[in-house]
Amino acid sequence: MGLVKMTRWRTLVLATAAFNLSFLIWFSFAPFTGQIAAEFGLSLTDLGILASAAIWSAPPGRILTGWLSDRFGASTVFGIVLAYVGIFSMASAFATSYEVFFVERVVVASAGITFVVGIQHVSQWFPEEELGTAEGIYAGIGNAGAAGGALILPRAFGNWSGPLFSTGWRAAFFYTGVVAILMAIVYVVFGQDAATKARAAATSESATLSTWVHTATRYGVVALALGYVMSFGLEISMNGWLPTYFREGFGSNLVIASTFAATFSLAAGLLRPIGGYVSDRLVRDQRDILPFFAGRYREQWTVLCMTFIVVSMTGLTFAGQTGNVLLTVAAGFLVGMSCAFTEGAIFAQVPAMFPNRSGAAAGIVGGIGTFGGIGFPLVYSFAAAEGMIHTGYVIVAALMIPILALNAFISRPHIASRAHVDGFFDGSRFESSQSDD
């Protein structure tokens, strides 16, 4: 029990602040890739692997912590993750070999798994008709932590010569770790798991292996998880790669490259609430924007947003090939906007599908979605190594087309109406309990 009486808005503020910090720490290495590469003798391919490695713990970690949040409560889980992330971030500041540094940063990167913990926490406090907007605010402002890191860290630590460290990136990792530990204490002390004890108990009791398997294998969850690969997976891949892209592709220095990259992160983060709000609004107004999917209001918006991603990624390649950096920054902003809208749309659907299993569902979708953050940086770095640094984006866009087609197929009204029940094995024995949700 927290020290003060929590409301849904106080819970939203607490979760959002903690996730914003988590996201900042997750990608705190990105502004310092040049310094890190120089100190450890890394190539562009090595940097691509480092950016990819930042995502390795996210898929299994999100899947596990989503279920743990249902079972044991978000306050406890969020506090534990922030505490060990802070410890390893501080430890990475003292690394003298790249092998030790690499392992420590993989552990620090598990800060990204807190996303599903906060999604579960917020869903336990807000009514269904406000879920899209509330989750969009949480994730949008939280995701903007990457932009905050890109803007603040190189300015605060770029020329660091203060106590303990003579290298900026080491100071940045140490002091952000300290802040993470302090936030862990705040979350455990003030957080409350649900609006009522009854709701927290119902969620905990539903967190079983059988219900998790059922949730993970429904058609709707599988389609949205892959949709999250092409939206959030894309976002985190770009957060890790864009500072390197602007530095190598346009000859920008550390601060300027990070600032250009931050425009993408700001769009991908701060515009996400719009995606959730539009989804909520279409449901309230019962408005069809894609008549082919008549009556499936959230699904229509999600498919439209996914299409926007494919188009904008193609545009980013063409913008980069012009050599005009401002045009490329603008194109990157549009990619960030498309990611934001799609992510907001997807997580307006997920908690509504499984209100008493929101942690498990969010963990599955959020966990699978991060695979894009592992694979896409490899495409970017290998294309760059072949002298085609701008071409990686259109290659990724082409890889997304089958995912878009699958989501359009699942969104057809007669399939979408049962996408939370029908799946890859017989779900009939769960159907009655799902109706109760």
UniProtKB/Swiss-Prot annotation:
Transmembrane segments: 12-32, 36-56, 76-96, 106-126, 134-154, 171-191, 221-241, 250-270, 300-320, 327-347, 359-379, 391-411
Induction details: Repressed by the presence of ammonium as nitrogen source.
SUPFAM superfamilies: MFS general substrate transporter (SSF103473)
Signal peptide positions on this chain: none
Alphabetical keyword list: Cell membrane, Membrane, Nitrate assimilation, Transmembrane, Transmembrane helix, Transport
Main location: membrane
Location in the cell: Cell membrane
GO biological process terms, semicolon-separated: nitrate assimilation
InterPro entries in alphabetical order: MFS, MFS_dom, MFS_trans_sf, NO3_transporter
One cellular component (GO) term of this entry: plasma membrane
Membrane topology note: Multi-pass membrane protein
Pfam families named in the record: MFS_1 (PF07690)
One MF term in the entry's GO annotations: nitrate transmembrane transporter activity
Similarity-based family: Belongs to the major facilitator superfamily. Nitrate/nitrite porter (TC 2.A.1.8) family.
Function, in words: Is likely responsible for nitrate uptake in the nitrate assimilation pathway.
Protein name per Swiss-Prot or TrEMBL: Probable nitrate transporter
Annotated source species: Haloferax mediterranei (strain ATCC 33500 / DSM 1411 / JCM 8866 / NBRC 14739 / NCIMB 2177 / R-4)
